[in-house]
Amino acid sequence: MSFSIRPDRRFPICCPVIYHVGLREGHGIVWNLSANGWRLSGDVPLRIGQTCPLTVNVPGQHPLFVAGVTLRWVRGQEYGVETVVVEKQTHSRLEHWITRLAQKSVECTP
């Protein structure tokens, strides 16, 4: 396994997620996110290289639909996915959410 540095900062979250693999619907939790990726766990197995859509239930907002993520790594039922297809409006919502998370993390720093 090669080592690589992530290009974007990841922020811890805990949000329900639904994803679709073929005819199967998976349910899980998103544990962290960045501008380009997500770490999630789920009940339907995924394989490296698979592409699937995600619907993330963001607290206090409408669900965030990401049309396509590609699976980059697997550890048991934990998955690292890269965002590859997202609508412009959804991308703007995601950027706004990340900006808010970044501001909160600065406020919490002693």
Question: Where do the PLM segments sit?
Answer:
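Structured alpha-helical
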Residues: 1-110
